[in-house]
Amino acid sequence: MATPESKVKKKVYELFDEYGENAYRITPTTGGYGSSGAPDIVVCFFGKYIGVECKAGKGKPTALQMKNLKSIMKAGGYAYVVNERSVGVFSLILSGILSKPNVPPQPEVSDLTYEFED
């Protein structure tokens, strides 16, 4: 059975899949061999490096996950935390990255899991 977080990942995969070969993505797995705290999804998106941490509901990244996302930002990449309610916002951000390719990433990790008012 799919977990709530895996449903968020699936939606993010689908967003990137719309861009075909212009969005090369991998899903790092640790399994004792990789680096703990790596983002759920790492993408080369039209030449831009993007790390995406997917969360369900009000879930927040661990301290190690935030450290890794901040490292991506310091290296010049983009880093986002996305949940099921912010996938649409993330889609708009991807469009913005394409429309303004020379605009540098934000100086902080973009946590898109903020509370939405119903």
Label each PLM-derived region with a short phrase.
Residues 1-118:
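Catalytic phosphate/metal-binding cores of nucleic-acid and nucleotide-processing enzymes, i.e., regions
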